[in-house]
């Protein structure tokens, strides 16, 4: 009997789709990049983040570390490619996305955000510490 992907803590495979700046698909599995916020598609910054990410990672091999949470149809975790390293940190460094403080409680992206400067996009209320 196969093990459910939802029970896995690590997922590896090709990136097949970029939904937007903070959601990718590895194979057929949607991953919400944890600790990251990007403006929505349909906004200038959101469209730039999505287009940039598509150019950088489609068909690249990713390793994702899942945290066991779900949001809508997506699993939640941090993903990296050999070319970019941590995708979230890379998008912050490019000033295309920002740190979502509430979901980066261990501060993994804190230094990346400090180096990049203030995020120019909108920080949603759910990113503020509760």
Task: Please give the residue ranges for each predicted region.
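Small beta-barrel nucleic-acid-binding modules, primarily SNase/OB-fold domains
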Residues: 2-130
């Amino acid at each position: 009997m196969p093990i459910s992907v939802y029970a896995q803590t690590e997922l590896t495979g090709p990136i097949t789709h970029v939904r937007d700046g903070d959601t990718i698909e590895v194979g057929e599995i949607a991953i919400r990049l944890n600790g990251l916020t990007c403006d929505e598609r349909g906004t200038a910054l959101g469209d730039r983040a999505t287009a940039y990410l598509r150019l950088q990672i489609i068909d690249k091999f990713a390793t994702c570390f899942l945290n066991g949470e779900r949001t809508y149809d997506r699993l939640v975790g941090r993903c990296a490619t050999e070319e970019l390293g941590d995708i979230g940190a890379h998008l912050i460094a490019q000033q295309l996305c920002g740190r979502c403080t509430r979901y980066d409680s261990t501060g993994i992206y804190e230094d990346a955000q400090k180096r990049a400067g203030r995020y120019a996009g909108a920080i949603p209320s759910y990113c503020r510490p509760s």
